[in-house]
Amino acid sequence: DDCGGLFSGCDSNADCCEGYVCRLWCKYKL
């Protein structure tokens, strides 16, 4: 998943949707 590579602290899709910035990325990814 791109989240882990683009945003540090987001190791998985689940973590992606938890963090603020990561959550924004998750929304755009969907």
Curated annotation (Swiss-Prot):
Family to which the UniProt record says this protein belongs: Belongs to the neurotoxin 10 (Hwtx-1) family. 19 (HpTX2) subfamily.
Tissue: Expressed by the venom gland.
Lineage: Eukaryota, Metazoa, Ecdysozoa, Arthropoda, Chelicerata
Domain notes: The presence of a 'disulfide through disulfide knot' structurally defines this protein as a knottin.
Highest taxon of the lineage: Eukaryota
Pfam families: Toxin_12
Record-given protein name: Kappa-sparatoxin-Hv1d
The keyword Transcription regulation belongs to this UniProt entry's keyword annotation: no
Keyword list, A-Z: Calcium channel impairing toxin, Disulfide bond, Ion channel impairing toxin, Knottin, Neurotoxin, Potassium channel impairing toxin, Secreted, Toxin, Voltage-gated calcium channel impairing toxin, Voltage-gated potassium channel impairing toxin
Cellular component annotations (GO), alphabetically ordered: extracellular region
